[in-house]
């Protein structure tokens, strides 16, 4: 419901980079894509906007979801933004309300295995490094650094 307003904000600040968290919270629980899909596509028209593949499990039926429940939503995001403007995110610790950390991250990590290497590298680290102006890890290239989440 915030995407139309977000598009107005982005239009006003064309030089400001923006990240859409949690795919802008589509209605995964209800298996709906509209109007989210159309609104997201309009926002993706702005080159200064990226989208995070995160927060999906809390939009699904808690602890009852399957990885493939999220594929069509990730397909829509990749089609709208392109892999160069999509990044992985964890939504930790909130994601643990609906699944464990490893399973939550595994949704995106497993999904991107079907993509070409360059797209995988962008989603799993490259887009994030460019957006935040940081260098990818020298040990892993643009792959994310694996670590245990910090305890609260």
Q: Predicted regions span which residues?
A:
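Catalytic pocket-lining loop regions of alpha/beta-barrel enzymes
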Residues: 1-87, 135-142, 146-152
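Mid-to-C-terminal alpha-helical segments outside catalytic/metal-binding sites
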Residues: 76, 80-87, 96-152
């Amino acid at each position: 419901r915030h995407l139309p307003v977000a598009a107005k904000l982005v239009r006003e600040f064309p030089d400001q980079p923006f990240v859409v968290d949690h795919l802008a919270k589509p209605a995964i629980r209800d298996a709906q894509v509209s109007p989210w899909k159309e609104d997201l596509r309009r926002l993706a028209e702005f080159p200064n906007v990226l989208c995070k593949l995160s927060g999906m499990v809390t939009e699904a039926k808690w602890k009852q979801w399957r990885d493939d429940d999220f594929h069509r939503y990730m397909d829509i995001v990749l089609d709208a933004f392109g892999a160069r403007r999509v990044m992985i995110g964890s939504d930790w610790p909130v994601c643990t309300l609906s699944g464990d950390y490893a399973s939550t991250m595994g949704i995106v990590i497993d999904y991107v295995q079907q993509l070409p290497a360059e797209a995988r590298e962008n989603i799993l680290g490259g887009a994030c490094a460019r957006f935040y102006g940081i260098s990818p890890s020298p040990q892993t290239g643009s792959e994310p650094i694996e670590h245990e989440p910090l305890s609260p």
